[in-house]
């Protein structure tokens, strides 16, 4: 019998949640996802030094203003890392918009267009890029605009059913509902461990997946943020799963049958009317975990973006 990673690939598109080229070469995922924390981590790897130097050189040619140079270097570094990753995968790279723009629709759209132009100027076409945005109301509206321009989006930091519904109604290409971070919250609150089959994060993604398929939404569901392979295996059959290298290694080393847990019902039920802004805020606010985790996720990505900027500024 093949290992669990090989079996999982037959049921689900496997994506690597990393900016590290060596890990991507080793596990040969279809796609890869990055975020500000992963870019910061990758920027500290020696083999990426030339990419940082090239990004600084680009930024200095764009502007004499140091603050602008820092911004441009960070953007170009994310794109340069994305370009390197694209050499080793057949699919798409997800590159994230600055988390500090999470409540700024116009700013998010402008930054997304800028990142896509950087990729396009390097010969990378839109069908190989996903722009990551936080699943705030403003982020979802930004994605709605971008999708109409042919820029596909990956809506991340998704914790509530309201966020998932709003994303589908906006016609976004893909969502990344988080699993492990939801489980973390309930584990801390209830002071207990969860079996994978009753893991609150697993149940959340399962509910979202089944809802999308029941109403025939085309938005891709890509489970993210895993704490163990049990969570991953409970979501076998999900459209895509983005998995960190350590858990890909565990799956590769594990033997035993992988059972399909999520099955596309191929439904075509009449869809409810799209949520209003007020309805979205009300429904999202009914979920204390989601409110807390969305805010925390944005703050943490912003902190890592700040660390990356400080590192770049020291090199300018």
Swiss-Prot record:
Main subcellular localization, coarse class? cytoplasm
Sorted keywords for this record are: Cytoplasm, Pentose shunt, Schiff base, Transferase
Q: Which GO terms describe its molecular function?
A: transaldolase activity
- What subcellular locations does the record give? Cytoplasm
Role this protein plays: Transaldolase is important for the balance of metabolites in the pentose-phosphate pathway.
Query: What does the similarity note say?
Result: Belongs to the transaldolase family. Type 1 subfamily.
Q: What is this protein called?
A: Transaldolase
Q: Which organism is it from?
A: Vibrio parahaemolyticus serotype O3:K6 (strain RIMD 2210633)
Q: What gene is it encoded by?
A: tal
């Amino acid at each position: 019998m093949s290992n669990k990673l090989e079996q999982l690939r037959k049921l689900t598109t496997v994506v690597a949640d990393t900016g590290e080229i060596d890990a991507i070469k080793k596990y040969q995922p279809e796609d890869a996802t990055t975020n500000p924390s992963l870019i910061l981590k990758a920027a500290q790897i020696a083999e990426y030094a030339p990419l940082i130097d090239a990004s600084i050189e680009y930024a200095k040619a764009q502007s004499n203003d140091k603050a602008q140079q820092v911004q441009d270097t960070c953007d170009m570094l994310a794109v340069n890392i994305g370009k390197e990753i694209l050499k080793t995968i057949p699919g798409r790279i997800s590159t994230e918009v600055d988390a500090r723009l999470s409540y700024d629709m116009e700013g998010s759209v402008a930054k997304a267009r800028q990142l896509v132009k950087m990729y396009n100027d390097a010969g990378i076409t839109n069908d190989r890029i996903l722009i990551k945005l936080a699943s705030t109301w403003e982020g979802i509206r930004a994605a709605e605009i971008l999708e109409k321009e042919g820029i596909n989006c990956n809506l991340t930091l998704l914790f509530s059913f309201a966020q998932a519904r709003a994303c589908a109604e906006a016609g976004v290409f893909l969502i990344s509902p988080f699993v492990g971070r939801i489980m973390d919250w309930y584990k801390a609150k209830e002071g207990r461990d969860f079996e994978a089959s009753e893991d609150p994060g697993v149940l959340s993604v399962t509910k979202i997946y089944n809802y999308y398929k029941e109403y025939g939404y085309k938005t891709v569901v890509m489970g993210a943020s895993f704490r163990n392979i049990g969570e991953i295996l409970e979501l076998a059959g999900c459209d895509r799963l983005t998995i960190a290298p350590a858990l890909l290694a565990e799956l590769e080393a594990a033997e035993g049958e992988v059972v399909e847990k999520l099955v596309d019902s191929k439904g075509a039920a009449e869809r409810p009317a799209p949520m209003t802004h007020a309805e979205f805020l009300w429904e999202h606010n009914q979920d204390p975990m989601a409110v807390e985790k969305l805010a925390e996720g944005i703050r943490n990505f912003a902190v890592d973006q700040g660390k990356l900027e400080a590192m770049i500024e020291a090199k300018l």
